[in-house]
Regions:
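Solvent-exposed, flexible loop/coil segments flanking beta-strands in beta-rich domains
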Residues: 1-35
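C-terminal interaction-tip segments
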Residues: 1-15, 106-126
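Exposed aromatic-hydrophobic patches
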Residues: 29-31, 85-93
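Noncatalytic modules at the cell exterior or secretory-pathway interfaces
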Residues: 38-42, 93-113
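Extended, low-complexity, turn-rich repeat/linker tracts enriched in Gly/Pro/Ser/Thr and Asp/Glu
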Residues: 47-55, 108-112
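Beta-strand signatures of extracellular beta-sandwich domains
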Residues: 57-61
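Short loop/turn segments immediately following beta-strands, especially the blade-tip
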Residues: 62-67
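Solvent-exposed serine/threonine-rich low-complexity stretches and specific carbohydrate-binding patches
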Residues: 71-81
Length: 126
């Protein structure tokens, strides 16, 4: 379902990862997609990595019960290294499990990344 005037009032922001500095691998909290329909757009915004040979891999995982998560097929951003990066990817809320979360893997020597991941989705009911 696309975004148009008729459904803009149903557009909702989803926080995958709030803006913060990350120095080690981790993940966000589960996001309940039960009240959403269609595609969910996720936006990664990352400053250039710090440290020596920094790498950042960000993926979306899903879970049926919000406790055991696994990688969602095709839901990986392009690796971020020494340059700032803004990227987007979409997932279908109809084709994944009820909960999703953002997972990030950081590598390198003393790596740091300032980043955020925000989602945009349409609520089923306005």
């Amino acid at each position: 379902m696309g975004y148009n005037r008729a459904n803009l009032e149903r557009l909702d922001l989803l926080t995958g990862l709030g803006t913060s500095t990350k120095t080690a691998t981790g993940q966000g909290t589960g996001i309940d997609l039960q009240d959403y329909e269609g595609d969910i757009l996720f936006i990664l915004d990352s400053a250039a990595g710090g440290g020596s040979s920094p790498t950042l891999d960000v993926t979306i995982e899903d879970s049926a019960e919000n406790s055991t998560f696994a990688a969602l097929s095709g839901a990986a951003f392009t690796q971020v290294t020494g340059s700032a990066s803004s990227q987007k990817l979409s997932i279908s809320s109809d084709e994944c499990k009820r909960y999703v979360r953002v997972k990030f893997t950081i590598g390198g020597s003393s790596p740091t990344f300032d980043l955020s991941v925000t989602g945009l989705g349409l609520k089923k009911y306005g």
